[in-house]
Amino acid sequence: MANISEISGDSNDGGDPNKKPEEQVLRRSRRIATRNENQNKKPKEEEEKDNRSVSFPIPNELTEACVALIRKCDYPSLSSVSSYFFNLIASSELYETRSRLGLSETFLYAAIRFPDTNPPNWYILHRNKVSSLRLSKLESLPPVPYGCSVVTIGQEMYVIGGLLDVRRLQLMTLIDCRTHKCRSLPKMKRGRYHAAAGVFDGKIYVIGGFRMRKPDAEWIEVFDLKKQIWESLPGPYPKTSMDSQFFAHAVMEDKLYILGSRCLIYEPKRNGEWDATVNANPIWNLWKVPCTMQCVIDDMLYTIDPQCTLGHPIVVYNPKDKTWRPVKGESLRTLPSYFVSDGSEMANFGGKLVILGSNGSCYDTGDCIGEKGIWCVMIELEKREGGEIWGKVESLDCVLGDINFLSVWLCQTLTL
């Protein structure tokens, strides 16, 4: 960005009435080129200092405070104005300011597959100019590999493994959710598909993802975020299961809960112990195939029970007392079927429960109303005496409409 003084007319170029216009333009162009050439010869540190002072003369602290007040959905437009704003929006200091001012926002990232596309693409759930929730495609991000595992750390998502054609990927990709740019990280030693993953003490643990577990396989790999290297853990591995492709996984109370044909509980902070009583744990009573959608809110596992075993379609598991409870509420009893069946996805949206579901199949039976597409229900949760959890539908919106037979593959949320 140039100062006003640099844009004003030059009396030496434009003040001689005897010169032809072509000569004036040519002479000014030469002067500008010479000036730019001289500027390019400055030391890098001096050039960067000049650019900072010229690009935006307002103090950085004041600019940062002003930008923090702007909604995150407007940041992409602002970042395209100049490199100064792009770097500001990509900085961790800006989001620390937003958090300090109580302006942090929760964003949901979903992998959405269209009938004629393969594989799914990344979409972000946000509020538009009129405060309606909408899903918008993130054009800058690559497609989402089938069967990948995703973990979130701060303002970043890590996409691990997956399937390309019939090949299991060793890749791990980091997505910076501030700028929606991505980069590749060091590869795993083994390709993985439908692996379990969790973050503990600055390390990403990845378990399984093979067709079958073998004694000499790197069944567990650990990525050190600080050193940026992968290491294999030799074991001991649980003797109760030879599974290596999992349906779902969740982290609660520093434990990694893994759902397969048999179920596992892994504790990295206790020297990699496996829970020996896992098959007697009541968590497997309602968290099971085929409806494996789940999310963790306040260290409790929420999932769907299509059979309404406890009288309600949404249930919650508390690992402290190892009990299942229904999420009660009259408005939850009347949720459309596509929210409480296999094919939907749920996530922790800033302490609220959000479920995405496609109503395309309902139109075939004629029992669906509203616009066809992907719908989002936002449920406010309330803890009551006796450990009861109650839910109330806060909003119900079509967030990606006029398209039939969309499918939701996964959901992740971050606070920015």
UniProtKB/Swiss-Prot annotation:
Composition bias type Polar residues, residue spans: 1-11
Gene3D superfamilies the UniProt entry points to: Kelch-type beta propeller
Positions with biased composition (Basic and acidic residues): 16-26, 38-52
Region ranges (Disordered): 1-55
InterPro entries: F-box/kelch-repeat_ARATH, Kelch-typ_b-propeller, Kelch_1
SUPFAM superfamilies named in the record: Kelch motif
Keyword Repeat tagged: yes
Kelch-type repeats, residues: 156-202, 203-250, 255-293, 294-344
Superkingdom to which the source organism belongs: Eukaryota
Keywords linked to the UniProt accession: Kelch repeat, Repeat
Protein name (database record): Kelch repeat-containing protein At1g19460
